[in-house]
């Protein structure tokens, strides 16, 4: 019985890793720049209601794979701080409405009147922040030295 359960867990882990490899490869091939939010996964795991779902997603593995494949395919990769108020700001007008309870999924901006899905609005804000800031210089971004 233990071996059967261990085998099932190994199969799930293999399927998850295969999915993460395929997704990260597709993203790195299609997009010139990928921007991710640097989430505090260990802090999120302290919420017992979300812990199992978060732990099973393999976010840190996904981030590492995306970073590696962006280097491989010469794409841009940026992380923005977890302290950016991505779900607290209207992606259209920039109005900041403040912290929202996690149960609130839809928001109407009182400044411009646009209805937002919380996750879509946060994704747009992450994109805007990532595209507006210059990328840190990395070895792959530097020109090759010229020989005399």
Where are these regions (language model features)?
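Substrate-contacting helices/loops that form the catalytic groove of nucleic-acid
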Residues: 1-63, 133-148
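Positively charged, low-complexity nucleic-acid-binding target-recognition regions
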Residues: 53, 57-148
């Amino acid at each position: 019985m233990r071996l059967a359960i261990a085998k099932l867990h190994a199969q799930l882990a293999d399927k998850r890793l295969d999915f993460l490899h395929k997704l990260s490869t597709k993203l790195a091939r299609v997009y010139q720049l990928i921007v991710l939010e640097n989430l505090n996964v260990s802090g999120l795991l302290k919420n017992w209601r979300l812990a199992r779902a978060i732990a099973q997603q393999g976010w840190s593995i996904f981030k590492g794979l995306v970073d590696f494949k962006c280097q491989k395919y010469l794409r841009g990769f940026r992380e923005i701080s977890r302290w950016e108020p991505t779900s607290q700001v209207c992606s259209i007008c920039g109005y900041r409405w403040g912290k929202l309870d996690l149960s609130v999924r839809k928001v109407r901006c009182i400044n411009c009147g646009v209805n937002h899905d919380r996750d879509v609005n946060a994704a747009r804000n992450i994109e805007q922040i990532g595209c507006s800031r210059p990328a840190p210089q990395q070895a792959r971004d530097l020109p090759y030295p010229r020989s005399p």
